[in-house]
Amino acid sequence: HLIMQYNISPETIIGFQPELASVDRMLEGDVDFSAFDKRTMTPNGAIFRTDKPGFLGELMEKYYTDRSKYKKLMIIEQKKQQKDKGNKTISNNISKYNNIQMARKIALNSAYGAIGNKYCRYYDVRQAEGITFAGQYSIRFIQRRVNEYLNNLLKTEKIDYVVASDTDSIYIRMGDVVKKMGLGDDIKKTVNILDKFCDQKLKPYIDEKYQELADYTHAYKQKMVMDKEVIANKGIWTAKKRYILNVYNSEGVDYDEPKLKIMGIEAVSYTHLTLPTNLRV
C-alpha cells in the first residue's frame, strides 16, 4: 500500500532531499508540501512524481486485488464452517483460499525486500527507506488520531488507548468503551456491539484521517486502509510482535468458543534434553 500511495518505483523517483522531512516533522505538520505540484515525498526525503503510475505500484495493485479476492472467499468459507464444522469440503476450501492469498501476501512483501537488496537490479536504499519511514509515519499518525477520537468520545484527556502497534497494525484497549455502553458481562453481546462500532464508527473515522494524510503529502493515491482483524477479551504481550490473544471474532467471523492467536511466541518450548523412555542396548 505504501508503494502505491507514494508511487514508489525505480522510474518515478526524481529527487532525494533528506533535510526537507522526517517522521516527527511530518507528524507535527511542519513540512510544507504546497510547492509539490505533481510530486510527493516520503519522510526520508525521497521525492516521487505523481503524474504517471510507476510499474511497481501497478504490480502491487494487481497482486493486492488478487489477494483480496481469495481472502474474501476464505472468510466466506470460515463463516460457513461455524455452522457446519465437520464439512471436509469447507475445510479444504479454507486451506486452498488461504494458501493462495498467503502466496500473494508474500509476493507483495517481497517487493520491499527486493528494493532493499543490493543484489537486486532495482536496488535503491532511498526507496527502501522511503517505504520504512512512510510506514512509521502512517502508524504513528493513526495511533495519535485514534487516541484523540477515543479521548473525545469517553471525555478523557491524554489517555493512551492504543496499547501496541506493529508495522501495519494498532491494538486498541476498548474496555472503557464497553463500560460507557453499559454492555455488562455478556461477552458475545459485547463482541457483537464492538464489531458494529468498529465498522460503523471507528473505520470511517480512520478512513477520513488517512485521506487527510494523503491530501497533506500530495500522495499519488489514498491507499492506507485499516480493517478490523480480531476482537479479543484478553491479550498478553511479551515484546513487539510477540503476543497471545483470546479471540472471539476474527475478520468478521464469530467463534462459538474463543481461539488463541499466538504470534512470535513458542506454544511449546523445550530447554532441556528429553531422555528416551524405551532404550535398548
Residue ranges and their predicted role:
Residues T271-T277:
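Conserved small/polar residues in nucleotide/adenosyl-binding loops
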Residues R67, I159-G175:
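Catalytic palm active-site di-aspartate
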Residues H1-R145, Y149, L153:
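Helical catalytic core of nucleic-acid polymerases
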Residues M224-A239:
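Short, conserved secondary-structure transition motifs
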